[in-house]
Amino acid sequence: MSITVFDPLTQVMILIFAFAFGAVFASFFTCMGGRIAQGRDWVKERSTCDSCGHVLGARDLVPIFSYLSTNGKCRYCGAKIPISCLVSEVLLGIYYVLCVLRFGISAEALRCMALSGLLLGLSIVDLEIYEIPDGFIIAGIVLWVITIPFVQTPWLTEVKQGLLGGLLIGGGMLVLSLIFDQISGKESLGGGDIKLFFMTGLFLKPACGLLSLILSCMVGLGFVLLLKKSKIPFGPAISIATCVTLLYGSYAVEWYLGLFL
């Protein structure tokens, strides 16, 4: 249901709530990703300052506002808090707003929001330890399965197109990586990246999955040039490309096909 059916004030309130939820989930998945990367229990452990170990209270855990109110420093020891925490909260908040504007109040919007949170979490882990835990991949697959009955696409079509997208993109990257591994004599693409391509392919379907693959390579190349490193974690690039394609990939595919039809 498009939010345009509501009056302007209600539309604004919906978008504000979407931004707030995005910021909250960004805080959660950023924390979870950081703890997993450090080998800590992300379920039972309480949030603490990484520098002084002080247990954080409720006022220290309000997304965006807690960071701004302390000028990006720990309230107890004055240690600097990475600005990446603030950036992730703002960006995911904006992304949630875009999801609502694109899909309205729908299962597609909720699916997109949930997947973007998972992608943020696994990107944090990949950036820290160059590894994508299988738990994120499994969670993504489960998310795809449980939302099939609620999206607008007929369930059988959703299953067929999703599996085809996952197998084509994930399987294709597996074959290509094996070929490059043989040629170069070293690993070109990690197993976690291939699994991630499969998982995101379930959501994107074949055409948008291919577009996401191209965007992933472009974003990855941008990271290489920007960071001036020969080796980078590819998970964040795949995640960024997936999030963009989820919102606007169908438009790009329709435009491209329209050039030939």
Question: What residues fall within each predicted segment?
Answer:
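Long, charge-rich boundary regions
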Residues: 9, 71, 75-143
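Membrane-proximal soluble regions of multi-pass membrane proteins
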Residues: 29-85
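Interfacial loop-to-transmembrane junctions
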Residues: 190-192, 224-244
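Residue-level signature of transmembrane alpha-helical entry/exit and packing/kink sites
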Residues: 11-19, 85, 89, 108, ...
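Functional transmembrane core segments of multi-pass inner-membrane proteins
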Residues: 109, 114-221, 255, 261
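Alpha-helical membrane-inserting segments
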Residues: 29, 33, 95, 99, ...
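Short, strongly hydrophobic alpha-helical membrane anchors
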Residues: 1-11, 258-261
